[in-house]
UniProtKB/Swiss-Prot annotation:
Superkingdom as given in the UniProt entry: Bacteria
NCBIfam families: AA-adenyl-dom, D-ala-DACP-lig, PRK04813.1
Any GO BP annotation: lipoteichoic acid biosynthetic process
Molecular function GO labels: ATP binding; D-alanine [D-alanyl carrier protein] ligase activity
Keywords: ATP-binding, Cytoplasm, Ligase, Nucleotide-binding
Name assigned to this protein: D-alanine--D-alanyl carrier protein ligase
Catalysed reaction, written as an equation: holo-[D-alanyl-carrier protein] + D-alanine + ATP = D-alanyl-[D-alanyl-carrier protein] + AMP + diphosphate
Enzyme class per UniProt: ligase
Amino acid sequence: MIKDMIASIEQFAQTQADFPVYDCLGERRTYGQLKRDSDSIAAFIDSLALLAKSPVLVFGAQTYDMLATFVALTKSGHAYIPVDVHSAPERILAIIEIAKPSLIIAIEEFPLTIEGISLVSLSEIESAKLAEMPYERTHSVKGDDNYYIIFTSGTTGQPKGVQISHDNLLSFTNWMIEDAAFDVPKQPQMLAQPPYSFDLSVMYWAPTLALGGTLFALPKELVADFKQLFTTIAQLPVGIWTSTPSFADMAMLSDDFCQAKMPALTHFYFDGEELTVSTARKLFERFPSAKIINAYGPTEATVALSAIEITREMVDNYTRLPIGYPKPDSPTYIIDEDGKELASGEQGEIIVTGPAVSKGYLNNPEKTAEAFFTFKGQPAYHTGDIGSLTEDNILLYGGRLDFQIKYAGYRIELEDVSQQLNQSPMVASAVAVPRYNKEHKVQNLLAYIVVKDGVKERFDRELELTKAIKASVKDHMMSYMMPSKFLYRDSLPLTPNGKIDIKTLINEVNNR
């Protein structure tokens, strides 16, 4: 068990100073370098005399200097707000307006001119590193101090800044490095794919730094070139893969993504969106010896609150895979619309309690009051997810409360429709979306479909293909759930975080 994230990193700087902490296509940085660089940057930040414990926005990609700056800010007592280089200017402005950071550190060129907030460039960070200033940690982030603040998309379009404290982070990290499901080895070799602005990134960097491992990052130019990206990934000596299931689906478009070509890859950690039976089955075919761990949890409960190793038996017997056993320190409950706790097997809203629950949204008391509360004497959070608990305390996922629609008199869960379509042996990926009329009522259901290789060639017309897909799922799909129109695509759009961009598809079919 670790008691201080920075102390853990500092220990490895003493015991394995020359061991790589970061590797970007062979360009390496060691634990000793991370200690020296973060000390120097922390001393530089202290010299700026910022307001104590004020948040600092850090703009960039998955580079070593981002990592060193994060560690430096933690040492100097400031929470960091990671903002990805691909963020839209409007979003960056909204984050700045809400967070009111005391400083902006631009590891990449900053796209905006902001009055009233000092900006530190990469050249200044490089100069600070060259100064090699010693640093004594007297006011580092600890306890309930904010460690990082990650902005998620709000339902109104306004981002919400989730405050994660040092204690929140320790609750998650200690569970992950000790839980048998994750089976994290010492000195883990982790793929660092999700951007730092997505809290799934914490699932790779926190256990890696806590156990003295190496992060294998990818340059941002490579991420845009999918063919080259997966050719490169196949050559990396990574042992643990952390991503959304959608990113793994994309990886499986490459024939090189298999156990024969990547024998070191033994663990897959999934979170951020639902892991489908179809994706898990394909992964077992590609990596017969691998462990597949399905984790679940909102950003507001520090990355994940439950996890389970997916077995072949689960893939054969479940239509929706279980999302795990809740963390021991985070009692998880199912409640009805009146807030009453439901019994095992009953479906309702998933709420999480315990020390991993955030203190709320930064500078947003109204939204905080809506989502955060106290349950059985512990801090609690409304996930907005539908689920149930089995008698064995396994959490089952039932979709999103806000992705439920009323259609033809039936209440339909969009993710359930997508799941059913994904059961077809002809479908590689499917998403159901509603089309609304002028009265904002659901007019009909549509489905975006990506078929498996070679399927289209078997049919002369799309109409015949649609009939065949419908026939392949009709035995386990209610007729009222069947989309009236299928739209075929070569791929589905992804958000910067690697999730299928359902909102873009909904806007597309509704001409928004």
